[in-house]
A protein has these predicted regions:
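Extracellular glycan-interacting surfaces
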Residues: 1-292
Length: 292
């Protein structure tokens, strides 16, 4: 198990019974996102079959991306990300820190990284190197070009059908690209941080929009690619006055949602009838499944 904290990363080899520091090489130590790719997903270029691609990734605040082939050997910073951060003036409205990387998604050797108040990054070599997608200029201001993504990117999903199908919730709405981030369409202009996309049907989505930061949050569903949205909170009081969905996780036949107040709710994907799970556990930030 690999976990990120406000002061580095920690690793457990006994499913959380004991923890050991695993942050060697981290300059920016506030970890906002952790991603681990299985060996089968770590494909190397055909002309370099002996070279290993990174298996673990960390996104930090201030915004930086770190990669590791073996966590025990330490982390390497992708300096091009920090250089973009400093040159373009990435920031967070609630913090003096220079933006943050708060989401990573992979499809084969293609990777995407969500930067809050910075835009969307792309890697074509398994996460070794990163650059802004063509449809994101990296400038933390609302774009005037409707084919550009809003820079306040909260998370990112790449669809199972294609590495070019990318969906990103932002402070300016939900965006989708069919060409790897070169051009974007805004599906809704509502503030959102989380979306789930059906791996078998890219037009089927569950969204957690809100009127603003943790204000009047709700859960909605679309089956037509975002043209229309219907309420998906049969067992909840909507909207929530002071909270919203931070993340969705598909686990088996269930969809789980982490809320901004740290509560964890779940629902069968077939009905989306939500209920609270683990009520005694507070301040949940993220969840992961373990292959036990």
């Amino acid at each position: 198990v690999l976990a990120g904290t406000r002061d580095g990363a920690y690793r457990s080899m006994d499913f959380g019974a004991s923890w050991w520091p695993a942050g060697e090489g981290l300059i920016e130590r506030h970890v906002r996102w952790v991603a681990v790719r299985a060996s089968a997903e770590r494909r190397t270029p055909a002309d370099a079959p002996s070279e290993a691609t990174p298996g673990a990734f960390i996104g930090t605040e201030p915004a930086a991306i770190y990669v590791a082939e073996d966590v025990q050997q330490g982390w390497r910073r992708c300096d091009e990300v920090a250089q973009l951060r400093d040159r373009l003036g990435w920031y967070l409205p609630y913090s003096p820190e220079a933006g943050c990387v708060r989401g990573l998604a992979f499809h084969g050797n293609r990777g995407y990284a969500a930067v809050e108040q910075g835009g969307l990054l792309r890697s074509d070599d398994g996460g070794e190197h990163w650059q802004l997608v063509a449809g994101s200029d990296g400038v933390p201001r609302t774009p005037t070009d409707p084919t550009m993504i809003h820079p306040d990117v909260h998370s990112v999903v790449v669809h199972a059908s294609s590495p070019d199908r990318v969906i990103a919730p932002t402070g300016g709405g939900l965006y989708v690209s069919d060409d790897g981030g070169a051009h974007w369409r805004r599906l809704t202009d509502r503030y959102c941080r989380a979306v789930w996309v059906d791996p078998d049907d890219a037009d089927h989505m569950v969204l957690g929009p809100a009127a603003g930061v943790a204000r009047d949050g709700r859960i909605e569903q679309s089956r037509d690619g975002g043209k229309t949205w219907q309420p998906a909170m049969d067992e909840c009081d909507a909207p929530w006055p002071h909270r919203m969905v931070e993340r969705f996780y598909e686990i088996g036949d269930e969809l789980m949602a982490v809320l901004s107040d740290g509560e964890l709710i779940t629902a069968p994907l077939s009905t989306l009838r939500w209920h609270v799970v683990l009520p005694a556990v507070q301040d949940v930030n993220a969840i992961a499944t373990l292959g036990i």
